[in-house]
C-alpha cells in the first residue's frame, strides 16, 4: 500500500463552502439550515446568534465543450510530467482523481503522483482548493513527519502532484500487523501526530481532516517514518480568525465545527479522538447514524468505564480528557499536549501490552464497510431491466443532451425538477460519490449503482439475491471460504475475513445467516463520512 488519493467528498462532511472563513463571505448568497444539535454544557449562543448559515454561491468555471487547455489551474504552464516521470500502477483512488506510482526518469527514484481530474474542478473554489493544497504542502515542506512535495504539473486534463512515496501502508494496518502494542508505543505515535499539528499551527495552517487513514508509513518496518498526507481540506489561518464551514469526518469532528464557530483548536480535538482509538480500538463518540455521531460529539460524554479502560493509566485518561474538552478555550494546545507527562520523553506511559481485544476491534472497525460495499455492488448488478426502468427514465430525463452521461449542471437541474432542496455542495457530494471512474460525469451504470440506495436496498428480494451470491453452496449460511471467494471475485484482497464474520455473526456460530446479513445491510453506515444518495437526496422515488 502506498500513498492513497483520498476522496475529498467520500470521507468528509460538507455544510457550506469548505474553503471560506467567516469574514470572507461574498455578497451573493444562499441560505442553508444549521446542523441539528442538542443542548450542550458549553454555551456557544453568543457565537451563533444567526439561525442559518449564509454561504457563497459557487461560480461554475467548467462546462461541457469548453476547451480545458485554455486555462491553467496552477496559473502557469508547466513541463510535461511524462518528460520527467514514468507513471505506472495505481496506488489509490479518490473522488477528485487517482494516485499512481511514478518514477523519476533521470534518477530512478520512486514517488507517488496524485493526478486530479480538471473536469472535477467545477467551480472557482475547487480550483482555489487545489492551488491552496499545493501551496500548503510547499509551505510545510521540511518537517520529517509531513509528506514532501516534489513538484506540481499540469496538462489539458489533469493536475499532477508528485510527492514522497509512502510504501509502508496505513498506521492502523501497521498496528494490526504488529499484533500487540503498549501505551508507550501509543504515546510515541501520538507524539508524532500532535507534532504535525503543532508544526501546522505554528506555520498558520489548520489541517481540518486528521484521521488515521491520513497517516502513512514510508517504511513498514519503521514506525517513526510516519507521514501526514492529504492537505486537501487544510487552510491558512490568522490568530483569532473564525471558520464556520463544517468539514471533516464524522468520528473525528470537533463540537465547535458542528456549531460552525471554530479555529485550530479543532485539530487537537481530532488528535484526541485518534488517541482514544489507539488505546481502545473504538471511537469515543459512536452511533448507528451520522446524526447520532454528531449528537454524541456535542454531548461530549467519554466512556472510561468499559474494557480496556480500567487497566489504562490515569495519565493517559487525563490527557484524553484535556484534548477532548468541549470548550475550545480550555482545551490543551498542541504544544501543551507535547508537554504532558504521558507523552513527553521518558514519560509515564507504561510499557504494558494492551488488551488484544483492542486490536480485534481495530480490525473489525476497518472491515465492515468493505463487505457492505461489495454487497451493494452485487445488488446493483442483479437488478433486472424491469426493476430499473423507472431509474432509467430518471437518468434519461436528466441527461438532457443525450450524451449518455450526466454532468454536474444536468444533475443539479434534474434534482430541482424532482423537488430536491439540496445545496450545490451536497449535490456535488452526491456526484462525486456516484462517479466511480472519476470521469467527471455519471454514466448510466454509475447512476443505477448509486440510486439503488434510494429505493432498492431495503427491498427484501434484492437482499435475498445478494445473500445468495455470497452463499455459494446454498446452505443458508455465508462461510469464511465463501466470503474469501467473493472477495477474490471483486478484487478485494486486503479484507480481514475472520473479523467480518465475527462482527456480523450475532449468534457466534462462525457463519453469517440471512438475518445477520440483513441486520448488517440495514445498520447505519457509520464508517463512511460522506453523504450518500440514500441519506441526502430529498426526493420521493415512489413514482419513478
Curated annotation (Swiss-Prot):
InterPro entries: CDPK_Ser/Thr_kinases, EF-hand-dom_pair, EF_Hand_1_Ca_BS, EF_hand_dom, Kinase-like_dom_sf, Prot_kinase_dom, Protein_kinase_ATP_BS, Ser/Thr_kinase_AS. The lineage of its organism: Eukaryota, Viridiplantae, Streptophyta, Embryophyta, Tracheophyta. ATP binds at residues 91-99, 114. Interacts with SLAC1. Interacts with FD. Pfam families: EF-hand_7 (PF13499), Pkinase (PF00069). Expressed in both guard cells and mesophyll cells. Expressed in the shoot apical meristem. This is Calcium-dependent protein kinase 6. There are 3 contiguous domains conserved in the CDPK subfamily: a kinase domain, an autoinhibitory (junction) domain and a calmodulin-like domain. The autoinhibitory domain (349-379) inactivates kinase activity under calcium-free conditions. May play a role in signal transduction pathways that involve calcium as a second messenger. Functions in abscisic acid (ABA) regulation of guard cell S-type anion- and Ca(2+)-permeable channels and stomatal closure. Phosphorylates FD. It is an enzyme of class 2 (transferase). Ca(2+) 4 binds at residues 505, 507, 509, 511, 516. GO terms for biological process: abscisic acid-activated signaling pathway; protein autophosphorylation; regulation of anion channel activity; regulation of stomatal movement; regulation of stomatal opening. It comes from Arabidopsis thaliana (Mouse-ear cress). Residues 26-40 have a biased composition (Low complexity). It comes from the Eukaryota. Belongs to the protein kinase superfamily. Ser/Thr protein kinase family. CDPK subfamily. Residues 1-47 are annotated as: Disordered.
